[in-house]
């Protein structure tokens, strides 16, 4: 039995399915959720809900949801216990990158990030893949499910945004997956998605990151400040990675009640996910891939060390900067 058939067998006989995205979901997560919903419908599941935590603040992600008409529910409005089956897409560990309790056990897990899918009835975690959408393209092909233009467009955009648009080790599988969905995708929709406008908040956060950057050798750290735009952090990190002579970037900021971090590296000697774990694992949830990673640290850990949020940001920024450069063995670099 193939993995696609094993997934379908879990869904057969299921009446209701809750698909939970990670917090602040990106196109890879959203397209994967849409693909799983399609597979579930093909298996006869009548009631399917796609839920997410956090917010969708990246301008392309908002346009992605609206233009492709992806129905989403806030996880706070969904009681997962009321569903026969619970699925995680593009994340593995409950509580690590979602508001769900760490005690929750998903029935289905499909992901390309490192993680232990404990006790799941069906788990397919392929860290050698560059995108979760790639896995779902293979499922759809193996199950001979016909692609709609909407689903093909979602998967193609996800593959590009997750890997193919960047020098981030896209695997041969991402190119093959993109080729297989290309003919069914609406290229005009993709063109409009790429033209999505930045929000003023995102521009402000990226501007603060550019102005605040601190560099050691080919690595730098920057602050996006106190922002409501979670997705501004990875966008700022991507932008700063274009600076001449820079190959590793960490951008941090205060978002709501937490410090968020986004890191990028194109240095083959650096595993940026492991670097964040080395520097910040004792403070919060961090991790990621060889070339891209992120993390979240609760503000409560530092609340007693500073007064207002500006002072807190300055205090936290100093500590994060020192620990990041230390994890890269750049304490004495200039």
Whereabouts are the PLM-identified features?
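Gly/His-enriched, cation/cofactor- and phosphate-binding structural elements
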Residues: 5, 12-17, 22, 30, ...
């Amino acid at each position: 039995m193939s993995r696609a058939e094993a997934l379908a067998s879990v869904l057969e006989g299921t009446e209701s399915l809750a698909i939970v995205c990670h917090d602040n979901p990106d196109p890879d997560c959203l397209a994967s959720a849409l693909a799983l919903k399609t597979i579930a419908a093909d298996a006869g599941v009548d009631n399917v809900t796609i839920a997410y935590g956090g917010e969708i603040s990246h301008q392309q992600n908002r346009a992605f949801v609206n233009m492709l008409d992806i129905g989403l529910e806030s996880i706070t409005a969904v009681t997962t216990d009321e569903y026969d089956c619970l699925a995680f897409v593009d994340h593995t560990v409950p509580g690590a990158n979602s508001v769900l309790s760490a005690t929750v056990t998903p029935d289905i897990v499909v992901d390309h990030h490192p993680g232990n899918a404990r006790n799941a009835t069906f788990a397919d975690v392929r860290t050698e893949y560059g995108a979760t959408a790639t896995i779902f393209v293979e499922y759809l092909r193996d199950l001979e499910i016909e692609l709609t233009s909407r689903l093909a467009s979602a998967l193609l955009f996800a593959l590009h945004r997750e890997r193919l648009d960047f020098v981030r080790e896209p695997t041969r599988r991402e190119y093959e997956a993109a080729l297989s969905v290309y003919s069914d995708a609406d290229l005009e929709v993709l063109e409009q998605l790429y033209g999505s406008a930045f929000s003023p908040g995102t521009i402000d956060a990226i501007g603060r990151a550019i102005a605040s950057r601190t560099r050691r050798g080919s690595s730098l750290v920057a602050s996006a400040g106190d922002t409501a735009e979670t997705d501004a952090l990875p966008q700022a990190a991507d932008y700063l990675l274009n600076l001449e002579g820079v190959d590793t970037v960490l951008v941090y900021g205060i978002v709501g009640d937490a410090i968020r971090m986004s890191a990028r590296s194109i240095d083959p000697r650096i595993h940026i996910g492991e670097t964040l774990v080395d520097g910040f694992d004792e403070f919060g949830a961090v991790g990621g891939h060889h070339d891209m990673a992120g993390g979240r640290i609760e503000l409560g850990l530092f609340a007693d060390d500073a007064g207002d949020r500006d002072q807190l940001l300055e205090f936290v920024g100093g500590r994060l900067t020192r620990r990041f450069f230390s994890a890269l063995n750049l304490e004495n670099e200039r």
